[in-house]
Amino acid sequence: MNFKETVLLLGMSMVVPVTSIAQDKVEASVGADLVSGYIWRGQDLGGVSIQPSLSVAYKGFSLGAWGSAGIESADTKELDLTLGYSTGGFSISVTDYWFNGGPGYFHYGTHHTSHVFEAQIGYDFGPLAVNWYTNFAGADGVNKDGDRAYSSYISLAAPFKLAGLDWTAEIGATPWANDFYNVSADPECSGSDGFAVCDISLGASKEIKITDSFSVPAFAKVTVNPRTEGAYFVFGLSF
C-alpha cells in the first residue's frame, strides 16, 4: 500500500487477514498478482503492477512479505512485512509498510522515515469479517491540530456466492480526522475531518481454465470512494 493513498485490490492477503487453522507443520507459500491498477482502501496507488508475496506459517503464527512494483518508472515501489497470529476467526497482526522515493530502508527516525507501522485486530464471523487497523509509528498522518493522527481504518467484508462466482462486498471508513487516507488532488475532498466512508467495493473471482490440469485465478473489483469522489475498476490474475 502506498502510505499516502494505499490501495491494494482484491489480491492482497497482507492487508485483510484470512482465518487459518493451526497446523503442526511449517507451511509456506509463494505467489504473485498481476493487476491493472493498485487500489487500496479506496485510494489510487498506481497503475499496472506486479505484486509478489511470500509467507510461512506455523501453529497459527505467520510471517509474510508482500510487495508492489508498477510498470511505470514513476510508480512507487513497496515492501510490506507482516507478523500475525490467528486462531478460529480471530486474527491479530503488525505490518511494516515501506515505500521508496524517500529515506532509505534503514531510516527509522521518528520524523525521517518511509516506514509506516500498523496494528490490526479482527474477527471473521463467517458471513461477515470485521477488521480494525491503526498506524502507531512511522510516517503516519496528522490530525487537524498537527498532532500524530494514529490514522485508523475499519472494514466490514461479506463474502457470498452468486452465479458460479465467489463475491465479496466491502465497506471501509476512517473513524477520525487524519491526512493519511483519502489523499486527493482536490483539496475539498482530501483527507478526513472526522468519520468518513472511503471504500465501498464489490469484487468477484473465479478460476480460468487454461488446460485440463492448469487454471489461473482471476478477479475483478469495483471500488468507489465517497470522500474523494473516486471510482475504480480493477482486474487481476494470480499466479
Predicted regions and their residues:
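Cleavable N-terminal export/targeting peptides
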Residues: M1-E27
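Short loop/turn motifs that connect adjacent beta-strands in outer-membrane beta-barrel proteins
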Residues: A22-E27, F160-A169, S205-A218
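Outer-membrane beta-barrel initiation region
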Residues: Q23-A57
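Residues that define the transmembrane beta-barrel architecture of outer-membrane proteins
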Residues: D24-V26, G46-I50, D75-L79, T113-F117, ...
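Transmembrane beta-strand segments that form the barrel wall of outer-membrane beta-barrel proteins
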Residues: V30-Y38, G60-I71, S91-G104, L128-G138, ...
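Outer-membrane beta-barrel translocator domains and adjoining extracellular loop/strand segments
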Residues: G42-G47, A74-D80, P103-T110, A139-D147, ...
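Outer-membrane beta-barrel "beta-signal"
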Residues: L202, I208, T228-F239
